[in-house]
């Protein structure tokens, strides 16, 4: 059904490095109930130690940072994760505005004449991932809003059908 292929680019390794730089390893290891050196080793691509899925889940939950999961998904050519537990149908405008903000950041980086440094590359990737998350949450919030108002859902379905019959969609 799906044809996942592992990327030749070290997305997961880069995500591990970024995660390690972003967080205090001693405090995080204590909160996770891990030895700090074990945590450092598992975040170091040069070491043979690897995270187990429950460890990835725990670190993502403790830090509210999806960098490791996004790196894992990018390694198999998948889009970043979308935390649907943050979904609130009344935040549709907020999701759209944040998505557009991230798109603006990406556009700014794309038209810049500055050299593409590693830091700029990571910032652009983070903007893309955040934008995808916000657009996905926008779509889910819109869907939830339409499901709670059947009349609105019927109007949208009718207009979509009329538009499709005239070749507008």
Swiss-Prot record:
GO terms for molecular function: DNA binding. InterPro entries: Phage_186_CII-like. Pfam families: Phage_CP76. Keywords: Activator, DNA-binding, Early protein, Transcription, Transcription regulation. Involved in the establishment of lysogeny. This is Regulatory protein CII. It comes from Escherichia phage 186 (Bacteriophage 186).
């Amino acid at each position: 059904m799906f044809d996942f292929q592992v990327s030749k680019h070290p997305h997961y390794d880069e995500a591990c490095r970024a995660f390690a730089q972003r967080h205090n390893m001693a405090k995080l290891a204590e909160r996770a109930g891990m030895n700090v050196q074990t945590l450092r080793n598992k975040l170091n691509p040069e070491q043979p130690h690897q995270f187990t899925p429950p460890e990835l889940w725990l670190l993502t939950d403790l830090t509210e940072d999806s960098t490791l999961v996004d790196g894992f998904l990018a390694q198999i050519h998948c889009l970043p994760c979308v935390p649907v537990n943050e979904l609130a149908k009344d935040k549709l405008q907020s999701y759209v505005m944040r998505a557009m903000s991230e798109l603006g950041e990406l556009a700014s980086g794309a038209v810049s004449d500055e050299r593409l440094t590693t830091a700029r590359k990571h910032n652009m990737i983070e903007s893309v991932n955040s934008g995808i998350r916000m657009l996905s949450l926008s779509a889910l919030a819109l869907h939830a809003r339409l499901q709670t108002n059947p009349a609105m859902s019927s109007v949208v379905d009718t207009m979509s059908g009329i538009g499709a019959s005239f070749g507008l969609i």
